[in-house]
Structures are given as structure tokens and as C-alpha cells.
A protein has these predicted regions:
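Single conserved hydrophobic/aromatic residue that forms the stacking wall/gate
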Residues: 1-5, 9
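Short juxtamembrane and helix-loop transition motifs at transmembrane-helix boundaries
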Residues: 10-15, 37-38
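Metal-dependent phosphoesterase signature
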Residues: 15-23
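Left-handed beta-helix
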Residues: 21, 27, 32-33, 38-47, ...
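Conserved beta-strand-loop-alpha-helix hinge in the C-terminal portion
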Residues: 113-135
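Alpha-helical subdomain
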Residues: 137-139
Length: 139
């Protein structure tokens, strides 16, 4: 199978997923092993986003681009991260490893390793093993 045929297949499959589930994941996003989509409806991942290994994305979450200001760019998400329902991560921010982002959180700042982030405006709480029992199917 040629590269062009493979790209056509990927685009057709992505189009079907977008229509059926509202799932919009850019083909230019870099995604590590073990991505888990919990209730995969209305999930958006912008182009050029970097997602590490063992990341859980839940219903309604958005990982998007900021087009202006100090945070212009896309997020980089580390390993073993859980992004809760209806959470939003925007701009050129780094989300560390072992981070749990609670439902309905809005993140537009860097988050260190081993943290739980919750609220809008979001607040960071340091916690060892933050994603224990929250990240599914480690690879």
C-alpha cells in the first residue's frame, strides 16, 4: 500500500469518526502509545499537538491552539495524563507526567509533574501518583 493510499484511507476514516462521534483529531498531531478515549464524543485535538504515552481523553475535552499572545502555540502533554470530561487545554503549555486534570477545568498554563488540576480558574495541587487508578491500560 503506497503512502498516498494510506493517507487517503486515514483521511476517510477520520472523516467518518468526525461525522459519527464529533471526534476531531488532526492527522498532524503526534500521539504516543496507549491513548484511551473514554466515551469518545466531541473530543478535539488541534494540529501539531504532542500527546505522550498512556493518556486518557474523556468526553468533550479540547486540546487546542492559541493564535496570539505569549502562549501562542499548541499544548505538549506528558505521559500518564488523564484529561477529564469537558476540560480544555489551550496554548503553548506543557503538561507534565502523572497529571490528572479534573472535569470542567480550563488550563492555559504549565502544569508540573505529579499534579492534580481542578477548577475554573484551575488550581494545581501537588500529589504523588496523581493518576493512580485513573489512567487505563498502561503500555
Amino acid at each position: 500500500c503506497s503512502s498516498a493510499a494510506s493517507d487517503v484511507y486515514k483521511r476517510q476514516r477520520l472523516y467518518r469518526l468526525t461525522k459519527k462521534y464529533g471526534l476531531e483529531i488532526s492527522l498532524s498531531a503526534t500521539i504516543g502509545k496507549g491513548l484511551y478515549l473514554g466515551h469518545p464524543y466531541n473530543i478535539t485535538v488541534a494540529s501539531d499537538v504532542i500527546i505522550g504515552d498512556n493518556v486518557n481523553l474523556h468526553k468533550g475535552c479540547t486540546i487546542g491552539r492559541e493564535n496570539r499572545g505569549d502562549r501562542a502555540g499548541v499544548p505538549k502533554i506528558g505521559n500518564n495524563v488523564s484529561v477529564g470530561i469537558n476540560s480544555t487545554i489551550v496554548g503553548k503549555v506543557n503538561i507534565g507526567n502523572d497529571v490528572m486534570i479534573a472535569p470542567n477545568s480550563f488550563i492555559n498554563f504549565d502544569v508540573p509533574d505529579h499534579s492534580v488540576v481542578l477548577g475554573n480558574p484551575a488550581k494545581i495541587h501537588s500529589k504523588e501518583y496523581a493518576t493512580k487508578c485513573y489512567v487505563n491500560f498502561l503500555v
